[in-house]
Each structure stands twice: as C-alpha cells, then as structure tokens.
C-alpha cells in the first residue's frame, strides 16, 4: 500500500492545480493590469467579428447580427453582436442589449433548445473573461450545462 503513495500525491496535486488554475489566474491578473492598454488596442483595430461575411449570418435585426461561433462549447453556440461596435455591455444602450436578447430567444426557438434549456452569456472585462472587445452574447444549448460553465 505504501508503494502507491506517489500516485495519490500526483492525483491530489493535479486536482489542486486544476482547481486553482494558477496559470489562468496569472493571465487574468496581467490582463486586468493592462485593461486600459487592451481597450485602446482593441479600439484601434477591427475585431474578428467585423469581418464575418453576410453569408455566415444565422440571424439579423435592425441593430444586431448572429453567427455560429467557430470555437463551439456546445452543440448550439451562436454569437450575437450589435452592428455598431461597443467595447462592453457597459458601453451599450439598454435597448441594444434588449434587442440582442430578443434575437437570442428567437434563435433558441428556431434551434429547438427553448424547452430543453439554454444559456446566454456576456463576458465583461478581464475578470469576466472577455477577450474580444466588441460586445457579444453567447447563446449556448443542446447539452446539459454545468453550474460553472
């Protein structure tokens, strides 16, 4: 029994590292420190969302468009963005955000995930895990979500 103690220690260490995520913690702390620079750089350059061709759009309203996320985290993973660029949800008028939510609900019904359940996510600033400074909402569904996704 004693000869297997290293396996136990390795499993415990892997669990602790996975839970604490020190690399992610350091990354987001650095990102938070650089927030003004990140925002300035983001405003100075077009975001990847601004080059999505119209043929890839899966939904549209007067002020918002939707398209499939290329890095899917669920069977249904759609991004909804305002046509006019806002860095974060804090910068956008409430009526634009409401229109984005309305488009997300319409798409959830079209994708038949309205009854089984879906998630709407808006990441804001570094601690909110925002990496692209163009307001965008994730519509996620088609699988059982965990409480911490």
Tell me what each language-model feature is.
Residues 2-149:
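HIT superfamily nucleotide-processing domains
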């Amino acid at each position: 029994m004693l000869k297997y103690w290293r396996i136990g220690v390795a499993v415990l260490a892997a669990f602790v590292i996975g839970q604490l995520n020190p690399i992610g913690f350091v990354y987001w702390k650095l990102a938070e420190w650089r927030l003004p620079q990140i925002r300035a750089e983001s405003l100075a350059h077009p975001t990847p969302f601004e080059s999505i061709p119209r043929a890839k759009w899966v939904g549209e309203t007067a002020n918002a468009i939707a398209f499939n996320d290329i890095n899917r985290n669920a069977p249904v993973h759609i991004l909804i963005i305002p046509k006019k660029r806002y860095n974060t949800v804090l910068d956008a008028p409430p009526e634009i955000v409401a229109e984005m939510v309305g488009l997300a609900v319409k798409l959830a019904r079209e994708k038949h995930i309205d009854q089984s359940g879906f998630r709407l996510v808006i990441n804001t600033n570094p601690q909110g895990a925002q990496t692209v400074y163009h307001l965008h909402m994730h519509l996620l569904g088609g699988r059982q979500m965990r409480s911490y996704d």
